Amino acid sequence: GGFHICPPGWNCELSNRNHFRAWGMEAKGWMIVETGSAAGLDGSIAKAAERGENWFGYYWSPTAIIGKYNMQAVDMGEYAGKDNWDNCLSKPEQECANPLKSSWVKSEVYSVATDNFKQTAGKEGMSYLEKRTYPGPVMNGMLVWMGENQAEGADAAIEFLKTQEDVWTKWVSKSAAKKIKKAL
């Protein structure tokens, strides 16, 4: 098989190469597939999907291509720790003698607000920010919709409110949800 890795010069190229070694993929008959660029990586996914072929490699989310082709993450087990990640997996191969098998670092996204916003938003506004979360498949799907419709953010917001009621109504009060639905 082939493991499609990040384009040259991207930080994820380093961790891709070290994951390849940690999992002993070469000894199992795998090879690294270098796509050369972000467009090349995207093209490799599209080509495989259009041919009905499997594709294995690194990609991030949320993105339209993940949503368009309904790609699934491979379970790579437990995260092997910050030391393994920072001092080995994320380094050039010559600086990472013994990479350990590891899942990826989990990226967390936070909403932040100024004191002024907190005061003017009130309890209901802050409650909304605390509850708001976009499930990955929903975000990927919205990015696909935006690309296919050449839509701007404002258009996507309306589409989201119309099609993802089960998601956003959990973020707001019943009275706010009723007003939003009426406005749509």
Regions flagged by a language model, labelled:
Residues 1-27, 31-44, 51, 136, ...:
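Bilobed "Venus flytrap"/periplasmic-binding protein-like clamshell domains
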